[in-house]
């Protein structure tokens, strides 16, 4: 289901009554409090789950699903993703965007010379990294920081960046 976006990752179980520990993959973990249904997905398996109860913790979320009533059933959910339809994401302010929206955008330098296309965005402790497939069939990892990323234009489908000398040059 291509129209789904991950908002959580099931890390393990909690207690014996079917609760699971979830790592939030969203900047809005409180969204779990108002979400009634998610889709659980792992590899090629996917099915809907109805949220019964949620407890927000410091870095994790505890979730109880109506369909899961014991630890044995909860164990089957471990290492799966909790997803929602993209049309249910939290609406952002103007000039804000989600990282998944950057995938597929064309990357230009300040002179509008095409550099490549964003393949994906890697989450990194220091800063996120744009993975760009360049026009020279190379991969460029570009930190997603203001020093390099000068403009993101979702409506027109591009990102304007300023690279340091040598970032695109081939090594001899």
Curated annotation (Swiss-Prot):
Superkingdom of origin: Bacteria
Entry-linked SUPFAM superfamilies: PRC-barrel domain, Translation proteins
Pfam assignment, any one: RimM
GO molecular function ontology, one term from the record: ribosome binding
Cellular location(s): Cytoplasm
InterPro entries: PRC_barrel-like_sf (IPR011033), PRC_RimM (IPR056792), RimM (IPR011961), RimM_N (IPR002676), RimM_N_sf (IPR036976), Transl_B-barrel_sf (IPR009000)
Any one of the GO CC terms: cytoplasm
Ranges where the PRC barrel domain occurs: 94-167
GO biological process: ribosomal small subunit biogenesis; rRNA processing
Record's keyword terms, sorted: Chaperone, Cytoplasm, Ribosome biogenesis, rRNA processing
Signal peptide per UniProt: none
Assembly behavior: Binds ribosomal protein uS19.
HAMAP family xrefs: Ribosome_mat_RimM
Role, per record: An accessory protein needed during the final step in the assembly of 30S ribosomal subunit, possibly for assembly of the head region. Essential for efficient processing of 16S rRNA. May be needed both before and after RbfA during the maturation of 16S rRNA. It has affinity for free ribosomal 30S subunits but not for 70S ribosomes.
Family assignment from sequence similarity: Belongs to the RimM family.
Record's comment describing the protein's domains: The PRC barrel domain binds ribosomal protein uS19.
Name of this chain's protein: Ribosome maturation factor RimM
Source organism of this protein record: Carboxydothermus hydrogenoformans (strain ATCC BAA-161 / DSM 6008 / Z-2901)
Organism placement in taxonomy: Bacteria, Bacillati, Bacillota, Clostridia, Thermoanaerobacterales
């Amino acid at each position: 289901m291509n129209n789904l976006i991950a908002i959580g990752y099931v890390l393990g179980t909690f207690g014996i009554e079917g609760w699971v520990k979830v790592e939030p993959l969203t900047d809005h973990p409180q969204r779990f409090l108002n979400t009634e249904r998610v889709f659980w997905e792992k590899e090629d398996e996917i099915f809907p789950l109805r949220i019964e109860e949620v407890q927000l913790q410091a870095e994790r979320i505890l979730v109880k699903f109506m369909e899961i009533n014991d630890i044995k059933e909860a164990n089957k959910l471990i290492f799966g993703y909790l997803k929602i339809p993209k049309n249910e994401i939290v609406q952002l302010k103007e000039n804000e965007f989600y990282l998944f929206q950057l995938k597929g955008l064309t990357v230009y330098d300040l002179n509008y010379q095409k550099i490549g296309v964003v393949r994906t965005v890697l989450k990194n402790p220091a800063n996120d990294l744009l993975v760009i497939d360049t026009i020279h069939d190379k991969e460029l990892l570009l930190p997603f920081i203001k020093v390099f990323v000068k403009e993101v234009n979702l409506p027109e489908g591009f990102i304007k960046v300023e690279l340091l000398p040598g970032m695109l040059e081939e090594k001899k």
